[in-house]
Amino acid sequence: MLGPLPDGRAVEHESWRAINRAAVAKMVSELAYEEAFQPAPLDRHETRWELRLASGVTYRFDAMRRIWGQLTVRPESLVRLAEGRELPVDDAVAFLADARETLRISPPTFCTYARELYNTLMADARILAARTDLSAGDLAALPDTELQRLLDGHPKAPASKGRLGWGLQDFAAYAPEFGGTIRLFWLAAARDRCRLSLAPDVGEESLLAAALDETEIERLKAACAEAGVSFRTHLLLPVHPWQWQGMLAAQFASEVAAGRLVPLGAFGDPFVPQQSLRTLANTRRADALHVKLPITILNTSAWRGVPGKYMDVGPVFSRWLAGCARHDPALQPLRVLEEVAGAFYPHPHYEHVPDAPYQFCEMLGVIWRESPDAHLSDGRRPMMMGALPQRDASGRPIVSALIARSGLGHAEWLDRLFGAVAVPLYHFMCRYGVGFIAHGQNVTVILDGAIPVGVAIKDFQGDADLVDQAFPELETLPEHVRKTLKRRPPAHLLQHLQTGQFASVLRFLSEALADHDGLDETVFYATLAGRLRRYQAEHPELSERFALFDLFRPKVPRIAINRVRFAIGYGDAGERPLPDLGTDLDNPLHIAETAHSSRATARSLLSGASL
């Protein structure tokens, strides 16, 4: 391959410049939002901005301040002023170098972050080429697995496709934007070394059948027989082919030599990677189980392994969540994508080292999870919620195309969306004391045509917490699950919804609709506030819980995921890095509700004066 473009072509000059401009615009916007630096307006209308850096370089650009406080930066307006010269901006790493002193980035951290940024730009070049001729309407019509190939990625992380550990050939083979398929590599693993957890109605044969047809199952069993593997002593584990080549073949060589792990080869249906890289979907059977597999690469702030500590409780916890959803009328729009099985094989030595870097303890495991397609009736389809703000080459977002196709107005369509997504997530918190980190990858919107009618949620191992209070509703959750999951104060669970869903998904959705459709963001958040207030009015029995989990406070936490990387660098650690906190944000729900109330009061006064 000569480069990442279709047919293996190298990156072209003009597209490279455009990709870099977009990356600089994103860095300026998100790092200013995180208070890593402070651009200043140059005019009273706050349309032209200036960023002065400690290096002596100044950047100027056009931008619009949004309701969350971030700036929507126009990439084509960016200019760099240095040594009396004004030049257009077309180098994202050069911007990072200019800002390094201001951002307090050490030289080692700068170089490694630049590696992540270059990898991201390479992936973005591929995405831009693949998406060039597709309108927002075209994108909206694609099946979810195909659409995920064409998305920009994490909206808050400029280096969202860092994938440290992969080269161009690995990107081409395993990254979603390249459109390739993956066949699972299989190991036979000694049962006395492997932790297996199954839902009550799930057997090992059904797990095999979700990834292999009958012919492939027979081939795999023949390979086991040839290797002398007994199913009495060993179980079959799928692994990501890169993980076998890049990590397991060497790091677990002693287990292979002892016969506790037996490599069998690649078998089964073709799978495609989703946005998270680790989760793979079956291309032949959309309703077949997805598999989540460790890939020991650094991507979007963390090593992408699969921890073993939640493996034993995954099927039980997700089954309990699904039961709550089935029997609670307020949760009817919600479907839990159950983790029907999990297996984990600990490393014989790393596992026993106190405070060992976490990536060495998460190398070999698998989670089998339901596909969103398994829950769908005719005419309904899934769409990753993070796809809604995605824009086409003209700047039109997918959400605009869906609203136009639905025949509904903006407010009515958004009311349907919030009723399908925000209300069930909030109800789970208030009724059951469960808080989900509901970011754009973990939440799947269910569409009936172009209208939101439901939501599917996933990833409960580390992305769901329980309230630290004695909610009676939690007593039906088995004790060993309650002891394993983290217990958090109400404010922390509330932050999961405010940060994971509102500030990480809705912030960009309202920005896209304001930017392209001209929808006032106060209308957007007044619609959300109105839908949540209607839900609260329907459940007066939860009034004390609503006070405990108050979404309408004037201020909300500001979470910073980028500046924490600049501060801590890339050294090994026993746990994943935690985000940093900035000054509190003005809560858009409070802003919108207050503005709506003020307008209603003004209308009432005017009406009274006219009588």
Predicted regions located by residue number:
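Nucleotide/phosphate-binding site architecture used for ATP/NTP-dependent chemistry
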Residues: 1-420, 447-611
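Intrinsically disordered, low-complexity segments enriched in polar/charged residues with Gly/Pro
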Residues: 266, 430-433
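An amphipathic, hydrophobic-aromatic interaction surface with interspersed Lys/Arg
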Residues: 419-431
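A short glycine-rich, hydrophobically flanked beta-strand micro-motif that places a catalytic Asp/Glu
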Residues: 432-446
